[in-house]
């Protein structure tokens, strides 16, 4: 997700865990493959050896920033690419990005946001109960899922 129309400056890498709808937003310096790869390596370090259990699949669009995702085979995570101009193929992510735009409107530079600002906005989104989730929050369900994974 980019801030300004020209795509320059900082951008946001966003991920959705499909079962719990947990939203993860990571600020990247630029919308480049290298910046996204660095963010994903940080996420891998955070998850440790259980990364394949936390992220069973990842679906990305065909943007040039995702060309290195094929190298995620070391994660034992399947990577799927959607067809160009098919945002409907990732509805949860698109809806959550729309919610994120309340905190960082289109055209607003992401450069001014700190990592803490980005994480705080994602936490607010994950803290909203969802009817689809039995009025639980994505955060509650994701935490329970992580507890299950890391205690097994």
Predicted regions located by residue number:
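Short active-site oxyanion
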Residues: 55-57
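Active-site beta-loop-alpha junctions of metal-dependent nucleic acid enzymes
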Residues: 4-8, 25-50
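Short small-residue beta-strand/loop micro-motif enriched in glycine and branched aliphatics
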Residues: 21-26, 81, 106
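Active-site proximal loops enriched in glycine and acidic residues that flank catalytic Cys/His/Asp
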Residues: 17, 27-28, 59-62, 83-84, ...
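Short, structured coil segments at secondary-structure junctions
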Residues: 74-76
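C-terminal domain-tail junction helix/linker
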Residues: 106-152
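RNase H-like two-metal-ion nuclease catalytic core shared by retroviral integrases
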Residues: 60-62, 67-69, 81-104, 111-123
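An active-site-proximal beta-strand-loop segment
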Residues: 1-20
């Amino acid at each position: 997700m980019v801030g300004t129309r020209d795509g320059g400056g900082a951008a946001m890498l966003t991920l959705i865990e499909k079962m719990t709808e947990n939203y993860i937003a990571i600020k990247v310096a630029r919308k480049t493959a290298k910046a996204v790869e660095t963010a994903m390596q940080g996420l891998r370090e955070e998850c440790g050896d259980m990364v394949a259990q936390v992220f069973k699949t990842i679906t990305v669009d065909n943007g040039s920033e995702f060309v290195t995702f094929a190298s995620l085979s070391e994660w034992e995570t399947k990577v799927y690419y959607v067809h160009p101009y098919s945002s409907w193929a990732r509805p949860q992510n698109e809806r959550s990005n729309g919610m994120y735009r309340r905190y960082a409107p289109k055209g607003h530079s992401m450069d001014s946001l700190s990592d803490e600002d980005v994480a705080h906005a994602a936490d607010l989104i994950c803290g909203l109960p969802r009817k689809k989730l039995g009025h639980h929050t994505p955060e509650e369900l994701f935490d329970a899922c992580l507890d299950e994974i890391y205690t097994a």
